[in-house]
Amino acid sequence: MSENTQPEQNQPLTGAPSPEELEAAQAANEFDALTQAQAELVTLQAKNTELADSYLRAKAETENARRRADDEIAKARKFALESFAESLLPVVDSLEAGLAHKDATPEQIREGADATLKQLKTTLERNKIVEINPASGSRFDPHQHQAISMVPAEQEANTVVSVLQKGYLISDRVLRPALVTVTAPK
């Protein structure tokens, strides 16, 4: 018989990998997985750095916007106060002109005071400051009136009898409530 007919013991079976080949293939797979994981890590670290930078920029933009808004509010308040003060200057001028007339009669003083009061009220209205002056017999409004006293009367309870001091609204907000006397419950 020839030597080729007997299978050799050192020769591996065809189709089945040897343990060394399995180990090498497993090591190659692990190396590929490690390489892929390292590449993903580098990508994720770059993305993290990019997101952290974007966050810091957005935070800085927000702080700058807040600072600009605060500055704008401060400027608006300052301008509103300046505008209001400027609108009062003609009233001051009228008072000073009236006081400069040393020989004015009581009637002239009264006319000057009436004109100056009218000028002041016009200025207040132009600046959205409106009187609260409830009519006698009107219903008591706790949002705009402050009851100072109660008096017995024939009218319905909580009805305004008299106004002791006018109140004022500024842009639909109570600056000072009107001080009123109201009817007591029967």
From Swiss-Prot:
Keywords: Chaperone, Cytoplasm, Stress response. Its main location: cytoplasm. SUPFAM superfamilies: Coiled-coil domain of nucleotide exchange factor GrpE (SSF58014), Head domain of nucleotide exchange factor GrpE (SSF51064). Transmembrane segments: none annotated. InterPro entries: GrpE, GrpE_coiled_coil, GrpE_head. GO terms for molecular function: adenyl-nucleotide exchange factor activity; protein homodimerization activity; protein-folding chaperone binding; unfolded protein binding. PROSITE patterns: GRPE. One of its GO terms (cellular component) is cytosol. It comes from the Bacteria. Residues 1-22 are annotated as: Disordered. It is found in: Cytoplasm. The keyword Cytoplasm applies. Pfam families: GrpE. Signal peptide: none annotated. Gene3D superfamilies: 3.90.20.20, Head domain of nucleotide exchange factor GrpE (2.30.22.10). Residues 1-13 have a biased composition (Polar residues). The keyword Cytoplasm applies. GO terms for biological process: protein folding. Homodimer. Belongs to the GrpE family. NCBIfam families: PRK14139.1, PRK14140.1, PRK14150.1. PANTHER family: GRPE PROTEIN (PTHR21237), GRPE PROTEIN HOMOLOG, MITOCHONDRIAL (PTHR21237:SF23). Participates actively in the response to hyperosmotic and heat shock by preventing the aggregation of stress-denatured proteins, in association with DnaK and GrpE. It is the nucleotide exchange factor for DnaK and may function as a thermosensor. Unfolded proteins bind initially to DnaJ; upon interaction with the DnaJ-bound protein, DnaK hydrolyzes its bound ATP, resulting in the formation of a stable complex. GrpE releases ADP from DnaK; ATP binding to DnaK triggers the release of the substrate protein, thus completing the reaction cycle. This is Protein GrpE.
